[in-house]
Protein backbone atom coordinates (compact mmCIF):
# COMPACT_ATOMS: atom_id res chain seq x y z
CA UNK A 1 0.00 0.00 0.00
CA UNK A 2 2.74 2.40 -0.99
CA UNK A 3 0.67 4.94 -2.91
CA UNK A 4 -1.30 7.71 -1.27
CA UNK A 5 -5.08 7.88 -1.08
CA UNK A 6 -5.27 10.48 -3.87
CA UNK A 7 -3.19 8.32 -6.22
CA UNK A 8 -5.52 5.31 -6.08
CA UNK A 9 -6.82 4.41 -9.53
CA UNK A 10 -10.22 3.51 -8.11
CA UNK A 11 -10.56 6.96 -6.52
CA UNK A 12 -9.87 8.55 -9.90
CA UNK A 13 -12.57 6.30 -11.38
CA UNK A 14 -14.99 7.33 -8.63
CA UNK A 15 -14.38 11.00 -9.37
CA UNK A 16 -15.29 10.40 -13.00
CA UNK A 17 -18.47 8.54 -12.00
CA UNK A 18 -19.40 11.40 -9.67
CA UNK A 19 -19.78 13.78 -12.62
CA UNK A 20 -23.04 11.94 -13.34
CA UNK A 21 -24.18 10.06 -10.22
CA UNK A 22 -27.45 8.18 -10.04
CA UNK A 23 -30.48 10.48 -9.95
CA UNK A 24 -32.74 9.36 -7.11
CA UNK A 25 -35.51 11.73 -8.22
CA UNK A 26 -36.18 9.98 -11.53
CA UNK A 27 -39.37 7.86 -11.53
CA UNK A 28 -38.56 4.20 -11.08
CA UNK A 29 -35.07 4.70 -9.68
CA UNK A 30 -36.05 3.40 -6.26
CA UNK A 31 -37.42 0.21 -7.76
CA UNK A 32 -38.17 -3.01 -5.91
CA UNK A 33 -35.06 -4.54 -7.47
CA UNK A 34 -32.83 -1.67 -6.30
CA UNK A 35 -34.22 -1.71 -2.78
CA UNK A 36 -33.75 -5.49 -2.52
CA UNK A 37 -30.30 -5.44 -4.12
CA UNK A 38 -28.89 -2.52 -2.15
CA UNK A 39 -29.45 -4.06 1.27
CA UNK A 40 -27.46 -6.28 3.61
CA UNK A 41 -28.66 -8.32 6.58
CA UNK A 42 -26.11 -9.57 9.12
CA UNK A 43 -25.53 -9.75 12.87
CA UNK A 44 -29.16 -8.90 13.67
CA UNK A 45 -29.15 -5.75 11.51
CA UNK A 46 -30.56 -4.91 8.09
CA UNK A 47 -28.75 -2.10 6.29
CA UNK A 48 -30.44 -0.33 3.37
CA UNK A 49 -28.44 1.96 1.11
CA UNK A 50 -30.81 2.22 -1.85
CA UNK A 51 -31.25 5.91 -1.03
CA UNK A 52 -27.52 6.61 -1.38
CA UNK A 53 -26.41 8.11 -4.70
CA UNK A 54 -24.63 4.95 -5.79
CA UNK A 55 -25.08 2.41 -8.55
CA UNK A 56 -23.21 -0.71 -9.64
CA UNK A 57 -20.43 1.40 -11.19
CA UNK A 58 -19.72 3.37 -8.05
CA UNK A 59 -20.05 0.32 -5.79
CA UNK A 60 -17.58 -1.62 -7.93
CA UNK A 61 -15.13 1.26 -7.74
CA UNK A 62 -15.61 1.56 -3.97
CA UNK A 63 -14.90 -2.15 -3.62
CA UNK A 64 -11.74 -1.71 -5.68
CA UNK A 65 -10.69 1.20 -3.47
CA UNK A 66 -11.18 -0.91 -0.34
CA UNK A 67 -9.02 -3.61 -1.92
CA UNK A 68 -6.37 -1.12 -3.08
CA UNK A 69 -6.13 0.25 0.45
CA UNK A 70 -6.04 -3.29 1.93
CA UNK A 71 -8.70 -2.42 4.47
CA UNK A 72 -9.50 -5.97 5.55
CA UNK A 73 -5.80 -6.74 5.96
CA UNK A 74 -5.42 -3.66 8.14
CA UNK A 75 -8.45 -4.63 10.23
CA UNK A 76 -6.98 -8.11 10.72
CA UNK A 77 -3.66 -6.57 11.73
CA UNK A 78 -5.36 -4.28 14.22
CA UNK A 79 -7.34 -7.08 15.85
CA UNK A 80 -4.22 -9.28 16.04
CA UNK A 81 -2.25 -6.61 17.88
CA UNK A 82 -0.03 -5.01 15.23
CA UNK A 83 1.20 -1.50 16.04
CA UNK A 84 -1.43 0.71 14.39
CA UNK A 85 -1.15 3.86 16.51
CA UNK A 86 1.95 5.48 14.98
CA UNK A 87 3.36 8.22 12.74
CA UNK A 88 6.41 7.11 10.74
CA UNK A 89 9.61 8.99 11.50
CA UNK A 90 8.15 11.11 14.30
CA UNK A 91 7.53 10.72 17.99
CA UNK A 92 4.18 9.03 18.49
CA UNK A 93 2.49 6.62 20.86
CA UNK A 94 3.60 3.59 18.78
CA UNK A 95 1.05 1.23 20.29
CA UNK A 96 -1.22 -1.62 19.39
CA UNK A 97 -4.95 -0.88 19.21
CA UNK A 98 -6.74 -3.63 21.08
CA UNK A 99 -10.21 -2.58 22.18
CA UNK A 100 -11.48 -5.64 20.31
CA UNK A 101 -9.45 -7.86 22.66
CA UNK A 102 -11.45 -6.58 25.64
CA UNK A 103 -14.41 -8.61 24.36
CA UNK A 104 -12.67 -11.32 22.31
CA UNK A 105 -12.70 -13.69 25.28
CA UNK A 106 -16.49 -14.16 25.04
CA UNK A 107 -16.09 -16.03 21.72
CA UNK A 108 -13.60 -18.41 20.13
CA UNK A 109 -10.54 -16.53 18.89
CA UNK A 110 -7.03 -17.17 17.59
CA UNK A 111 -5.30 -14.17 19.15
CA UNK A 112 -1.63 -14.31 20.03
CA UNK A 113 0.96 -12.29 21.95
CA UNK A 114 -0.27 -8.93 23.26
CA UNK A 115 -3.78 -9.37 21.86
CA UNK A 116 -4.15 -12.72 23.63
CA UNK A 117 -2.73 -11.20 26.80
CA UNK A 118 -5.27 -8.35 26.77
CA UNK A 119 -8.09 -10.82 26.10
CA UNK A 120 -6.96 -13.00 29.01
CA UNK A 121 -6.57 -10.03 31.34
CA UNK A 122 -10.00 -8.74 30.27
CA UNK A 123 -11.57 -12.08 31.13
CA UNK A 124 -9.93 -12.04 34.56
CA UNK A 125 -11.10 -8.46 35.17
CA UNK A 126 -14.62 -9.46 34.13
CA UNK A 127 -14.62 -12.35 36.59
CA UNK A 128 -13.37 -10.01 39.33
CA UNK A 129 -16.16 -7.63 38.36
CA UNK A 130 -18.78 -10.37 38.72
CA UNK A 131 -17.55 -11.09 42.26
CA UNK A 132 -17.46 -7.40 43.13
CA UNK A 133 -20.98 -6.78 41.81
CA UNK A 134 -22.42 -9.59 43.91
CA UNK A 135 -21.63 -7.58 47.04
CA UNK A 136 -21.87 -4.04 45.65
CA UNK A 137 -25.33 -4.42 44.11
CA UNK A 138 -26.75 -5.55 47.45
CA UNK A 139 -25.05 -2.75 49.39
CA UNK A 140 -25.46 0.30 47.13
CA UNK A 141 -28.53 1.71 45.37
CA UNK A 142 -26.78 4.41 43.33
CA UNK A 143 -23.62 4.76 41.23
CA UNK A 144 -21.91 7.94 40.09
CA UNK A 145 -19.33 7.57 37.32
CA UNK A 146 -16.70 10.32 37.23
CA UNK A 147 -14.78 10.56 33.96
CA UNK A 148 -14.31 12.66 30.84
CA UNK A 149 -14.32 11.91 27.12
CA UNK A 150 -14.41 8.19 26.46
CA UNK A 151 -14.67 7.50 30.18
CA UNK A 152 -18.12 9.09 30.05
CA UNK A 153 -19.50 9.32 26.51
CA UNK A 154 -19.47 5.65 25.51
CA UNK A 155 -20.59 4.19 28.86
CA UNK A 156 -23.29 6.86 29.18
CA UNK A 157 -24.60 6.21 25.66
CA UNK A 158 -24.71 2.47 26.31
CA UNK A 159 -26.32 2.84 29.74
CA UNK A 160 -29.20 4.82 28.28
CA UNK A 161 -29.37 2.48 25.27
CA UNK A 162 -30.12 -0.45 27.60
CA UNK A 163 -32.04 1.35 30.33
CA UNK A 164 -35.38 0.91 28.57
CA UNK A 165 -35.15 -2.86 28.19
CA UNK A 166 -33.20 -4.05 31.23
CA UNK A 167 -35.01 -4.01 34.58
CA UNK A 168 -33.03 -2.14 37.20
CA UNK A 169 -33.67 -0.63 40.61
CA UNK A 170 -30.35 1.23 40.48
CA UNK A 171 -29.86 4.96 39.95
CA UNK A 172 -26.96 5.99 37.70
CA UNK A 173 -25.38 9.43 37.28
CA UNK A 174 -22.42 10.68 35.25
CA UNK A 175 -20.17 13.58 36.20
CA UNK A 176 -17.75 14.76 33.54
CA UNK A 177 -17.48 18.53 33.28
CA UNK A 178 -15.03 20.44 35.43
CA UNK A 179 -17.85 22.95 35.91
CA UNK A 180 -18.69 22.44 39.61
CA UNK A 181 -22.39 22.81 38.83
CA UNK A 182 -22.23 19.40 37.11
CA UNK A 183 -21.12 17.73 40.33
CA UNK A 184 -23.41 19.87 42.48
CA UNK A 185 -26.54 18.86 40.60
CA UNK A 186 -25.67 15.19 41.13
CA UNK A 187 -24.75 15.63 44.79
CA UNK A 188 -28.17 17.05 45.57
CA UNK A 189 -29.82 13.96 44.03
CA UNK A 190 -27.96 11.18 45.85
CA UNK A 191 -27.74 9.67 49.31
CA UNK A 192 -23.98 9.42 49.72
CA UNK A 193 -24.24 6.53 52.16
CA UNK A 194 -25.99 4.45 49.48
CA UNK A 195 -23.79 5.65 46.60
CA UNK A 196 -20.81 4.02 44.90
CA UNK A 197 -18.40 6.44 43.19
CA UNK A 198 -16.50 5.09 40.16
CA UNK A 199 -13.56 7.26 39.10
CA UNK A 200 -12.23 6.52 35.61
CA UNK A 201 -8.86 7.82 34.43
CA UNK A 202 -6.32 5.73 32.53
CA UNK A 203 -3.41 7.95 33.56
CA UNK A 204 -4.77 8.65 37.02
CA UNK A 205 -3.94 12.33 36.54
CA UNK A 206 -6.59 13.62 34.09
CA UNK A 207 -7.68 17.07 35.27
CA UNK A 208 -11.47 16.77 35.17
CA UNK A 209 -11.88 13.45 37.01
CA UNK A 210 -9.16 14.41 39.50
CA UNK A 211 -10.96 17.64 40.42
CA UNK A 212 -14.40 16.00 40.57
CA UNK A 213 -13.07 13.09 42.61
CA UNK A 214 -11.72 15.57 45.15
CA UNK A 215 -15.05 17.41 45.23
CA UNK A 216 -16.91 14.18 45.97
CA UNK A 217 -14.31 13.06 48.51
CA UNK A 218 -14.85 16.26 50.48
CA UNK A 219 -18.61 15.71 50.37
CA UNK A 220 -18.11 12.24 51.89
CA UNK A 221 -15.70 13.53 54.50
CA UNK A 222 -18.14 16.29 55.46
CA UNK A 223 -20.71 13.56 56.15
CA UNK A 224 -18.22 11.52 58.18
CA UNK A 225 -18.23 8.71 55.60
CA UNK A 226 -15.21 6.63 54.58
CA UNK A 227 -14.00 7.40 51.07
CA UNK A 228 -12.26 4.03 50.80
CA UNK A 229 -15.57 2.25 51.44
CA UNK A 230 -17.40 4.03 48.61
CA UNK A 231 -14.89 4.80 45.84
CA UNK A 232 -13.80 2.50 43.00
CA UNK A 233 -10.99 3.26 40.53
CA UNK A 234 -10.73 2.21 36.89
CA UNK A 235 -7.20 3.02 35.76
CA UNK A 236 -4.00 1.71 34.21
CA UNK A 237 -1.75 -0.55 36.23
CA UNK A 238 0.85 1.53 38.05
CA UNK A 239 -1.01 4.83 37.78
CA UNK A 240 -1.35 7.09 40.85
CA UNK A 241 -4.89 5.74 41.25
CA UNK A 242 -3.76 2.10 41.28
CA UNK A 243 -3.79 1.87 45.07
CA UNK A 244 -6.31 -0.33 46.87
CA UNK A 245 -5.61 1.35 50.19
CA UNK A 246 -7.57 4.35 48.88
CA UNK A 247 -10.34 2.52 47.02
CA UNK A 248 -12.89 -0.18 47.69
CA UNK A 249 -11.69 -1.85 44.48
CA UNK A 250 -9.39 -1.07 41.55
CA UNK A 251 -10.06 -2.34 38.03
CA UNK A 252 -7.53 -2.07 35.22
CA UNK A 253 -7.38 -1.04 31.59
CA UNK A 254 -4.47 -0.89 29.18
CA UNK A 255 -2.58 1.63 27.04
CA UNK A 256 -3.64 -0.20 23.89
CA UNK A 257 -7.32 0.51 24.63
CA UNK A 258 -8.13 4.09 23.68
CA UNK A 259 -10.69 6.01 25.70
CA UNK A 260 -13.22 6.39 22.90
CA UNK A 261 -13.07 2.64 22.30
CA UNK A 262 -13.16 1.60 25.97
CA UNK A 263 -16.86 1.00 26.69
CA UNK A 264 -16.36 -2.78 26.51
CA UNK A 265 -13.53 -2.65 29.06
CA UNK A 266 -14.02 -2.02 32.76
CA UNK A 267 -14.65 1.63 31.81
CA UNK A 268 -18.13 0.51 30.81
CA UNK A 269 -18.18 -2.77 32.67
CA UNK A 270 -18.50 -1.45 36.21
CA UNK A 271 -21.37 0.95 35.53
CA UNK A 272 -23.27 -1.33 33.13
CA UNK A 273 -22.78 -4.37 35.36
CA UNK A 274 -23.91 -2.44 38.43
CA UNK A 275 -26.95 -1.02 36.66
CA UNK A 276 -28.21 -4.15 34.94
CA UNK A 277 -26.25 -7.12 36.28
CA UNK A 278 -23.18 -8.94 35.03
CA UNK A 279 -25.19 -11.13 32.63
CA UNK A 280 -26.39 -8.08 30.70
CA UNK A 281 -22.84 -6.75 30.40
CA UNK A 282 -21.75 -10.16 29.09
CA UNK A 283 -24.53 -10.10 26.47
CA UNK A 284 -23.41 -6.61 25.46
CA UNK A 285 -19.85 -7.90 25.00
CA UNK A 286 -21.14 -10.78 22.88
CA UNK A 287 -22.79 -8.34 20.48
CA UNK A 288 -19.60 -6.31 20.10
CA UNK A 289 -17.40 -9.39 19.71
CA UNK A 290 -19.69 -10.82 17.05
CA UNK A 291 -19.44 -7.57 15.07
CA UNK A 292 -15.64 -7.70 15.44
CA UNK A 293 -15.61 -11.08 13.69
CA UNK A 294 -18.06 -9.86 11.05
CA UNK A 295 -15.82 -6.85 10.31
CA UNK A 296 -13.25 -9.29 8.89
CA UNK A 297 -15.65 -10.41 6.12
CA UNK A 298 -13.59 -9.91 2.94
CA UNK A 299 -16.39 -8.81 0.56
CA UNK A 300 -17.46 -5.18 0.94
CA UNK A 301 -21.13 -5.76 0.09
CA UNK A 302 -21.32 -8.42 2.84
CA UNK A 303 -19.45 -6.43 5.52
CA UNK A 304 -21.67 -3.95 7.37
CA UNK A 305 -19.07 -1.52 8.77
CA UNK A 306 -16.87 -1.69 5.66
CA UNK A 307 -19.81 -0.97 3.36
CA UNK A 308 -20.92 1.96 5.53
CA UNK A 309 -17.34 3.25 5.67
CA UNK A 310 -16.94 3.20 1.90
CA UNK A 311 -20.29 4.92 1.35
CA UNK A 312 -19.01 7.56 3.77
CA UNK A 313 -15.83 7.92 1.68
CA UNK A 314 -18.02 8.36 -1.41
CA UNK A 315 -20.07 11.09 0.25
CA UNK A 316 -17.11 12.87 1.85
CA UNK A 317 -14.32 12.65 -0.71
CA UNK A 318 -16.14 12.23 -4.00
CA UNK A 319 -19.48 14.01 -3.62
CA UNK A 320 -17.77 16.51 -1.25
CA UNK A 321 -20.36 16.65 1.54
CA UNK A 322 -18.77 18.18 4.68
CA UNK A 323 -21.07 16.83 7.40
CA UNK A 324 -22.97 13.67 8.30
CA UNK A 325 -26.10 13.53 10.45
CA UNK A 326 -26.80 10.44 12.54
CA UNK A 327 -30.49 10.22 13.45
CA UNK A 328 -31.60 7.37 15.72
CA UNK A 329 -35.35 6.88 15.90
CA UNK A 330 -35.08 5.55 19.45
CA UNK A 331 -35.19 7.43 22.73
CA UNK A 332 -32.63 5.01 24.16
CA UNK A 333 -30.01 6.35 21.74
CA UNK A 334 -30.37 9.97 22.84
CA UNK A 335 -26.69 10.15 23.85
CA UNK A 336 -25.33 7.93 21.08
CA UNK A 337 -24.57 10.69 18.57
CA UNK A 338 -22.44 12.50 21.17
CA UNK A 339 -20.40 9.31 21.55
CA UNK A 340 -20.07 9.02 17.76
CA UNK A 341 -18.82 12.60 17.57
CA UNK A 342 -15.86 11.61 19.73
CA UNK A 343 -15.38 8.19 18.18
CA UNK A 344 -15.44 9.56 14.63
CA UNK A 345 -14.04 13.07 14.87
CA UNK A 346 -11.34 12.43 17.48
CA UNK A 347 -10.28 9.39 15.46
CA UNK A 348 -10.33 10.84 11.96
CA UNK A 349 -10.26 14.60 12.44
CA UNK A 350 -6.63 14.54 11.29
CA UNK A 351 -4.64 16.38 8.62
CA UNK A 352 -1.37 14.41 8.86
CA UNK A 353 -0.79 11.04 7.20
CA UNK A 354 0.87 8.05 8.83
CA UNK A 355 4.01 9.16 6.97
CA UNK A 356 3.93 12.50 8.79
CA UNK A 357 2.90 14.49 5.72
CA UNK A 358 0.04 16.94 5.39
CA UNK A 359 -2.91 15.44 3.54
CA UNK A 360 -4.62 17.29 0.70
CA UNK A 361 -8.07 15.76 0.91
CA UNK A 362 -10.97 15.81 3.34
CA UNK A 363 -10.94 13.48 6.32
CA UNK A 364 -13.65 13.16 8.98
CA UNK A 365 -16.91 14.94 8.28
CA UNK A 366 -18.55 16.89 11.06
CA UNK A 367 -20.81 14.37 12.82
CA UNK A 368 -23.98 15.61 14.42
CA UNK A 369 -27.61 14.68 14.99
CA UNK A 370 -30.42 14.05 17.43
CA UNK A 371 -33.26 11.65 18.10
CA UNK A 372 -36.19 11.32 15.70
CA UNK A 373 -38.97 12.30 15.47
CA UNK A 374 -37.99 15.24 17.71
CA UNK A 375 -35.42 16.62 15.30
CA UNK A 376 -37.89 16.57 12.40
CA UNK A 377 -39.30 19.63 14.14
CA UNK A 378 -35.96 21.39 14.55
CA UNK A 379 -33.29 21.02 11.84
CA UNK A 380 -34.95 18.78 9.22
CA UNK A 381 -36.11 21.88 7.35
CA UNK A 382 -32.47 22.50 6.52
CA UNK A 383 -31.88 18.87 5.56
CA UNK A 384 -34.69 19.02 3.00
CA UNK A 385 -34.36 22.53 1.57
CA UNK A 386 -31.12 24.03 2.87
CA UNK A 387 -28.17 24.97 0.68
CA UNK A 388 -25.91 22.24 2.13
CA UNK A 389 -26.58 18.60 1.33
CA UNK A 390 -26.14 16.48 4.46
CA UNK A 391 -25.96 12.68 4.18
CA UNK A 392 -28.10 11.11 6.90
CA UNK A 393 -27.58 7.80 8.69
CA UNK A 394 -30.93 6.68 10.08
CA UNK A 395 -31.05 4.07 12.86
CA UNK A 396 -34.34 2.37 13.72
CA UNK A 397 -35.97 -0.56 15.50
CA UNK A 398 -39.12 -2.52 14.74
CA UNK A 399 -40.05 -3.03 18.39
CA UNK A 400 -39.89 -0.59 21.29
CA UNK A 401 -38.04 -1.41 24.49
CA UNK A 402 -40.54 -0.90 27.27
CA UNK A 403 -43.54 -2.69 25.76
CA UNK A 404 -45.88 0.23 26.37
CA UNK A 405 -47.73 1.42 23.27
CA UNK A 406 -51.16 2.39 22.04
CA UNK A 407 -53.04 2.04 18.77
CA UNK A 408 -54.55 5.22 17.44
CA UNK A 409 -56.17 5.60 14.01
CA UNK A 410 -55.21 2.05 13.12
CA UNK A 411 -51.48 2.14 13.93
CA UNK A 412 -49.32 1.91 17.04
CA UNK A 413 -46.88 4.58 18.19
CA UNK A 414 -43.99 2.30 17.23
CA UNK A 415 -45.40 1.94 13.72
CA UNK A 416 -45.81 5.70 13.43
CA UNK A 417 -42.22 6.18 14.57
CA UNK A 418 -40.85 3.77 11.97
CA UNK A 419 -43.09 5.21 9.26
CA UNK A 420 -41.56 8.62 9.91
CA UNK A 421 -38.04 7.22 9.56
CA UNK A 422 -38.83 5.63 6.18
CA UNK A 423 -40.71 8.72 5.02
CA UNK A 424 -37.79 11.03 5.77
CA UNK A 425 -35.34 8.83 3.86
CA UNK A 426 -37.62 8.70 0.81
CA UNK A 427 -38.44 12.41 0.96
CA UNK A 428 -34.77 13.34 1.07
CA UNK A 429 -34.00 11.05 -1.85
CA UNK A 430 -36.92 11.67 -4.19
CA UNK A 431 -37.95 15.21 -3.34
CA UNK A 432 -41.08 16.70 -4.88
CA UNK A 433 -41.60 19.22 -7.64
CA UNK A 434 -43.99 22.12 -7.26
CA UNK A 435 -44.84 25.25 -9.22
CA UNK A 436 -44.39 27.15 -5.98
CA UNK A 437 -40.59 27.32 -5.52
CA UNK A 438 -41.00 27.58 -1.75
CA UNK A 439 -42.71 24.19 -1.72
CA UNK A 440 -40.19 22.54 -4.03
CA UNK A 441 -37.93 19.75 -2.73
CA UNK A 442 -34.97 19.05 -5.00
CA UNK A 443 -34.24 15.60 -3.58
CA UNK A 444 -31.03 13.68 -4.30
CA UNK A 445 -30.12 14.01 -0.63
CA UNK A 446 -28.53 10.70 0.33
CA UNK A 447 -29.21 8.55 3.36
CA UNK A 448 -28.88 5.02 4.68
CA UNK A 449 -31.06 3.07 7.11
CA UNK A 450 -29.75 0.64 9.74
CA UNK A 451 -32.52 -1.39 11.41
CA UNK A 452 -32.69 -4.08 14.10
CA UNK A 453 -35.66 -5.80 15.68
CA UNK A 454 -35.15 -4.23 19.11
CA UNK A 455 -32.46 -2.29 20.98
CA UNK A 456 -31.28 -5.16 23.19
CA UNK A 457 -27.93 -5.40 25.03
CA UNK A 458 -26.53 -7.60 22.26
CA UNK A 459 -27.69 -5.21 19.54
CA UNK A 460 -26.30 -2.25 21.53
CA UNK A 461 -22.90 -3.96 21.59
CA UNK A 462 -23.10 -4.69 17.88
CA UNK A 463 -24.09 -1.11 17.10
CA UNK A 464 -21.19 0.25 19.17
CA UNK A 465 -18.68 -1.99 17.36
CA UNK A 466 -20.26 -1.29 13.96
CA UNK A 467 -19.36 2.39 14.27
CA UNK A 468 -15.96 1.72 15.84
CA UNK A 469 -15.04 -0.37 12.80
CA UNK A 470 -16.60 2.02 10.33
CA UNK A 471 -14.38 4.84 11.60
CA UNK A 472 -11.31 2.58 11.70
CA UNK A 473 -11.88 1.48 8.09
CA UNK A 474 -12.15 5.11 6.99
CA UNK A 475 -8.93 6.04 8.77
CA UNK A 476 -7.18 3.07 7.13
CA UNK A 477 -8.48 4.21 3.75
CA UNK A 478 -7.27 7.77 4.24
CA UNK A 479 -3.90 6.58 5.54
CA UNK A 480 -4.13 8.53 8.79
CA UNK A 481 -3.66 7.50 12.41
CA UNK A 482 -7.15 7.10 13.85
CA UNK A 483 -5.90 6.18 17.31
CA UNK A 484 -4.17 9.22 18.79
CA UNK A 485 -5.57 12.63 19.74
CA UNK A 486 -2.78 15.18 19.68
CA UNK A 487 -5.36 17.88 18.98
CA UNK A 488 -6.58 17.61 22.55
CA UNK A 489 -3.23 18.50 24.11
CA UNK A 490 -2.47 22.09 23.06
CA UNK A 491 -5.52 23.65 24.69
CA UNK A 492 -4.93 21.60 27.85
CA UNK A 493 -1.31 22.83 28.04
CA UNK A 494 -2.36 26.45 27.64
CA UNK A 495 -5.15 26.02 30.20
CA UNK A 496 -2.57 24.81 32.72
CA UNK A 497 -0.54 27.98 32.16
CA UNK A 498 -3.62 30.17 32.44
CA UNK A 499 -4.65 28.45 35.68
CA UNK A 500 -1.19 29.34 36.94
CA UNK A 501 -1.74 32.97 35.98
CA UNK A 502 -5.08 33.05 37.77
CA UNK A 503 -3.62 31.56 40.94
CA UNK A 504 -0.54 33.80 40.85
CA UNK A 505 1.79 30.83 40.56
CA UNK A 506 2.97 31.41 36.98
CA UNK A 507 5.39 33.93 35.48
CA UNK A 508 3.93 36.77 33.44
CA UNK A 509 5.26 35.61 30.04
CA UNK A 510 1.80 34.99 28.57
CA UNK A 511 0.59 38.50 27.73
CA UNK A 512 -2.27 37.41 25.45
CA UNK A 513 -3.87 35.29 28.15
CA UNK A 514 -3.24 37.95 30.79
CA UNK A 515 -5.00 40.61 28.72
CA UNK A 516 -7.98 38.36 28.00
CA UNK A 517 -8.31 37.59 31.69
CA UNK A 518 -8.18 41.29 32.48
CA UNK A 519 -10.83 41.97 29.82
CA UNK A 520 -13.20 39.62 31.59
CA UNK A 521 -12.26 41.00 35.03
CA UNK A 522 -10.67 37.72 36.10
CA UNK A 523 -7.39 39.51 36.80
CA UNK A 524 -7.10 43.00 38.24
Swiss-Prot record:
Main location: cytoplasm
Record key words, sorted: Cytoplasm, Gluconeogenesis, Glycolysis, Isomerase
Pathway named in the protein's UniProt entry: Carbohydrate biosynthesis; gluconeogenesis; Carbohydrate degradation; glycolysis; D-glyceraldehyde 3-phosphate and glycerone phosphate from D-glucose: step 2/4
Superkingdom of source: Bacteria
InterPro entries tied to this protein: G6P_Isomerase, G6P_Isomerase_C, Phosphoglucose_isomerase_CS, SIS_dom_sf, SIS_PGI_1, SIS_PGI_2
Gene Ontology biological-process annotations: gluconeogenesis; glucose 6-phosphate metabolic process; glycolytic process
Gene Ontology, cellular component aspect: cytosol
Record Pfam families: PGI
PROSITE patterns cross-referenced by the UniProt entry: P_GLUCOSE_ISOMERASE_1, P_GLUCOSE_ISOMERASE_2, P_GLUCOSE_ISOMERASE_3
EC number(s) given by UniProt: 5.3.1.9
The keyword Isomerase is assigned to this record: yes
SUPFAM superfamilies, A to Z: SIS domain
Enzyme class: isomerase
Molecular functions per Gene Ontology: carbohydrate derivative binding; glucose-6-phosphate isomerase activity; monosaccharide binding
Catalytic activity: alpha-D-glucose 6-phosphate = beta-D-fructose 6-phosphate
Subcellular location per the Swiss-Prot or TrEMBL entry: Cytoplasm
Catalytic residue positions: 346 (proton donor), 377, 492
Job of this protein: Catalyzes the reversible isomerization of glucose-6-phosphate to fructose-6-phosphate.
Family as reported in the entry's similarity comment: Belongs to the GPI family.
PANTHER family: GLUCOSE-6-PHOSPHATE ISOMERASE
Name of the protein: Glucose-6-phosphate isomerase
Name of the encoding gene: pgi
Amino acid sequence: MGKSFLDCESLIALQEIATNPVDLTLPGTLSQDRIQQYALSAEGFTYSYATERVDDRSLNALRMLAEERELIKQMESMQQGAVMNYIEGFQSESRSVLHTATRAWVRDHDLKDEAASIANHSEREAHRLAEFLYAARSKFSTLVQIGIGGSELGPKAMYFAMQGICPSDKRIFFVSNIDPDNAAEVLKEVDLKQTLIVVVSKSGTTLEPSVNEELFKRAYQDKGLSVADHFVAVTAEGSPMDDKTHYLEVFHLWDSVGGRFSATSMVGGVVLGFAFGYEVFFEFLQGAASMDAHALTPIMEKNLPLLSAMLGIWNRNVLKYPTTAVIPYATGLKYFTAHLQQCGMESNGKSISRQGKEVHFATSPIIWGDVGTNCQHSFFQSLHQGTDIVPVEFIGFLQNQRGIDCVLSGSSSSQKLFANLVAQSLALAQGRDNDNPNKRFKGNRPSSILVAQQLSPRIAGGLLAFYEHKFAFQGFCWGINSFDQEGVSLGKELATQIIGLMSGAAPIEFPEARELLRLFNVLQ
